[in-house]
Amino acid sequence: MTTQYGFFIDSSRCAGCKTCELACKDYKDLTPEVSFRRIYEYAGGDWQEDNGVWHQNVFAYYLSISCNHCEDPACTKVCPSGAMHKREDGFVVVDEDVCIGCRYCHMACPYGAPQYNETKGHMTKCDGCYDRVAEGKKPICVESCPLRALDFGPIDELRKKHGDLAAVAPLPRAHFTKPNIVIKPNANSRPTGDTTGYLANPKEV
């Protein structure tokens, strides 16, 4: 492998505006039911009494998630046709001419990255905009973010600059597939496995 690319996700900046998601849908000409990049809204909190005075500790934060181009992708392991594969540059992509549309990859991926396109009759997914990267550009989602909450580059450089946190609630633990992402947590972020909050927009992700 030449270079493993990855995404930096700054949850402290993300306002959940979905500009990245819409820019991706436009650039990739996606159908309404398919979104390669999705915005997770995690929220929770309750009321607590302190000497007869009630206080609330309500919280919410956003995470912009697409395919994480994992080091150990679950999708490639279950693909019976070999359509789902990892390139030399680390991008996990699907060969749409080979895909048989069995959806095993979608069932295996803990992030729901591979998505079935009803119109095309096979699986589709984020490819990291490798065509843009080859031209020295960043993925369209990164370029479109108005709050600069996303960045992209060699994962080793991103980890050196931002640390190696790769999981907060509601994401799964990173050891399952070793996702190539780095997360800067929101002040309200909860650890993976947290039960004090819930996914507030399940139909959108």
Swiss-Prot record:
One Pfam assignment: Fer4_11
Binding of [4Fe-4S] cluster 2, residues: C24, C126, C129, C141
Cofactors: [4Fe-4S] cluster
Keyword Metal-binding: yes
Cofactor binding mode and count: Binds 4 [4Fe-4S] clusters.
Sites where the protein binds [4Fe-4S] cluster 1: C14, C17, C20, C145
Keywords on record: 4Fe-4S, Electron transport, Iron, Iron-sulfur, Metal-binding, Repeat, Transport
Region Disordered, residue ranges: 184-205
Residues annotated as binding [4Fe-4S] cluster 4: C79, C99, C102, C105
Superkingdom assignment: Bacteria
Binding site for [4Fe-4S] cluster 3: C67, C70, C75, C109
Ranges for domain 4Fe-4S ferredoxin-type: 5-33, 59-89, 90-119
Assembly behavior: Heterotrimeric enzyme composed of a catalytic heterodimer (DmsAB) and a membrane anchor protein (DmsC).
The name this protein goes by in its record: Anaerobic dimethyl sulfoxide reductase chain B
Gene source species: Shigella flexneri
